[in-house]
C-alpha cells in the first residue's frame, strides 16, 4: 500500500500548470448522496478562476458514452451554478449506474474520445466510489485525462469520501425519531441501512442515534449474545417505566454476515448494473431470528403477563418491526462537513489536472498542500476499525458479540494537531 502523496511526490512528476486545458467535463456517477453538488460547484468555481470552462456531462458514464449523439451540454457558468445549492443532496449533473467496461462495444473508448472532441473537452473531473474509480483508471489508460473526487456514502474507500457524513447524520436522525413510535407500542425496531460490505454508516449513525444494538458486516453475528442483550435491556426499560413503555432499537448494515461469515442476501433482489448482488433482506432476517427467540422464551410470556400486555392468541410476544429508510438516507440535505469537503475536492481536482496529473484520486488537503493517491490504492475497501467498536461496547452498545476488554494506550499530543475543523 502506498501512502497518500502530495504534489511533490515523484511518482507523479509535476509538469507545471497545464494550460492546454480549456474545457473540463464534470461527471457524477454511481449512487447519489449528499455533497455532490458541492463537488460540482467547487470544480466549476475553481475552473472559472483559471479561465477554464466547465460542462455538466449528464447521466454519469451513460452520458459520457453517448456524448457523440448529444446535441449540446450545459455550461456551468457562474450564473448557472448559482441556481443550485451545495446544501442539497443529489447531483445537478445527474447519474446512472453504468460501468464503461460492461458496455458491449469494442470501440467504446474511441467513441468516448470522439464525443469529448466534439465538445472540445480536454479533461474530466469524475466523482464516485470504487466502481467509478476503476473506470477512471480505465479512461486514463486510454489517454483520457481525468481526476477522481471520492464519493460514497458507504465510506469504504481509503480516503474520506463525500456523502458519508450526510448519510450518518440522516441515519442518526431516523434511529432517534423511530423511538417515539417504538416506545408507544413497546416494539423492537430494526432499521436496515445501506453500506454494502462495510459497516461505517451503521456504526456511526447507530451510535449517534443511540441505538441499543448495531450489527455490521465486520462482525459475524452471535444471535445468543444479541438476544441476551435485547432481553436484558428491553425488559428492564419497560419494567422501570411508570407507564410500562419502552423500545429496543437495532441498526443493521445491509451487508450483514451470518455466524459462518456468509453475507445475507434476498436472492429475489437480483443484481445491479455493476454486476453486484443487491444487498437486501438483512433487516428481515434479523427480525425473524429475534421473533423466533422471543416466541420460544417462557420468560417473555411471563413478562408480557406481568406488564399487562399479554392476550392469548393475539398478543403473546413483543412486536418486531423492520424499517428500511432506503434512499431517504441519500436524499434531502448535505451536512456542513460534506459541503466543505465536496467544494475542496472539486476545486483541488482542477488543481491536480493543472499540475499534469491524471488517473489519481484526490485524498485531502491541508492549507496549500493537496494530497492524492494512486487510484488503485484509493479504491481498496476500508472496513470499520474493531478497536473503536470495543470502546463503544464498554458504553453498553451491543455489536452482536461477547464484549471485548478495552485497555487503551495513552499518549500526549503537542503542537497543531489534525482535527475535522
Show where each model-derived region lies.
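N-terminal phosphate-binding or glycine-rich loops at protein starts, especially the Walker A/P-loop
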Residues: 20-68
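Short glycine-rich or small-residue beta-strand-to-loop segments that form or flank ligand, phosphate
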Residues: 23-31, 91-96, 122-126, 188-192, ...
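Short, ordered loop/turn segments at secondary-structure junctions
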Residues: 29-32, 57-63, 97-98, 129-132, ...
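Short glycine/serine/threonine-rich phosphate/pyrophosphate-binding segments
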Residues: 33-43, 64-65, 109-110, 124-137, ...
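Accessory alpha-helical/coil subdomains and C-terminal extensions
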Residues: 54, 123-128, 134-138, 145-146, ...
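Glycine-rich oxoanion-binding loops at beta->alpha junctions
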Residues: 67-124, 131, 162-176
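C-terminal non-catalytic interaction/assembly regions of soluble proteins
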Residues: 266-421
Amino acid at each position: 500500500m502506498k501512502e497518500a502523496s502530495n504534489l511533490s511526490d515523484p511518482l507523479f512528476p509535476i509538469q507545471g500548470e497545464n494550460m492546454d486545458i480549456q474545457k473540463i467535463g464534470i461527471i457524477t456517477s454511481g449512487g447519489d448522496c449528499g455533497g455532490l453538488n458541492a463537488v460540482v460547484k467547487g470544480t466549476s468555481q475553481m475552473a472559472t478562476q483559471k479561465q477554464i470552462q466547465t460542462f455538466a456531462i449528464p447521466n454519469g458514464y451513460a452520458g459520457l458514452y453517448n456524448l457523440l449523439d448529444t446535441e449540446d451540454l450545459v455550461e456551468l457558468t457562474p450564473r448557472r451554478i448559482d441556481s443550485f445549492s451545495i446544501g442539497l443532496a443529489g447531483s445537478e449533473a445527474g447519474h446512472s449506474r453504468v460501468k464503461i467496461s460492461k458496455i458491449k462495444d469494442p470501440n467504446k473508448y474511441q467513441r468516448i474520445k470522439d464525443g469529448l472532441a466534439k465538445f472540445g473537452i480536454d479533461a474530466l473531473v469524475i466523482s464516485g466510489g470504487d466502481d467509478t474509480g476503476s473506470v477512471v483508471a480505465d479512461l486514463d489508460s486510454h489517454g483520457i485525462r481525468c481526476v477522481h473526487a471520492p464519493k460514497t456514502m458507504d465510506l469504504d474507500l481509503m480516503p474520506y469520501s463525500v456523502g458519508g457524513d450526510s448519510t450518518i447524520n440522516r441515519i442518526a436522525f431516523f434511529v432517534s425519531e423511530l423511538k417515539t413510535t417504538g416506545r408507544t407500542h413497546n416494539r423492537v425496531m430494526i432499521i436496515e441501512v445501506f453500506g454494502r460490505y462495510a459497516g461505517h454508516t451503521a456504526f456511526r449513525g447507530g451510535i449517534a442515534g443511540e441505538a441499543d444494538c448495531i450489527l455490521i458486516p465486520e462482525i459475524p453475528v452471535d444471535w445468543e449474545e444479541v438476544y441476551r442483550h435485547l432481553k436484558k435491556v428491553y425488559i428492564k426499560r419497560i419494567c422501570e417505566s411508570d407507564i410500562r413503555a419502552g423500545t429496543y432499537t437495532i441498526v443493521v448494515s445491509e451487508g450483514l454476515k451470518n455466524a459462518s461469515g456468509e453475507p445475507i442476501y434476498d436472492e429475489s433482489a437480483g443484481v445491479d448494473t455493476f454486476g453486484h448482488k443487491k444487498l437486501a433482506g438483512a433487516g428481515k432476517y434479523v427480525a425473524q431470528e429475534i421473533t423466533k427467540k422471543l416466541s420460544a422464551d417462557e420468560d417473555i410470556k411471563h413478562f408480557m403477563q406481568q406488564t399487562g400486555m399479554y392476550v392469548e392468541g393475539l398478543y403473546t410476544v413483543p412486536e418486531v418491526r423492520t424499517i428500511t429508510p432506503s434512499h431517504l438516507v441519500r436524499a434531502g440535505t448535505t451536512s456542513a462537513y460534506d459541503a466543505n469537503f465536496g467544494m475542496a475536492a472539486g476545486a483541488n481536482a482542477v488543481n491536480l489536472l493543472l499540475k499534469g496529473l491524471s488517473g489519481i484520486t484526490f485524498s485531502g488537503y491541508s492549507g496549500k498542500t493537496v494530497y492524492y493517491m494512486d487510484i488503485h490504492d484509493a479504491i481498496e475497501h476500508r472496513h470499520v476499525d474493531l478497536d473503536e467498536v470495543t470502546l463503544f461496547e464498554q458504553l453498553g452498545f451491543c455489536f452482536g458479540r461477547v464484549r471485548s476488554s478495552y485497555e487503551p494506550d495513552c499518549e500526549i499530543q503537542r503542537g497543531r494537531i489534525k482535527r475535522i475543523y
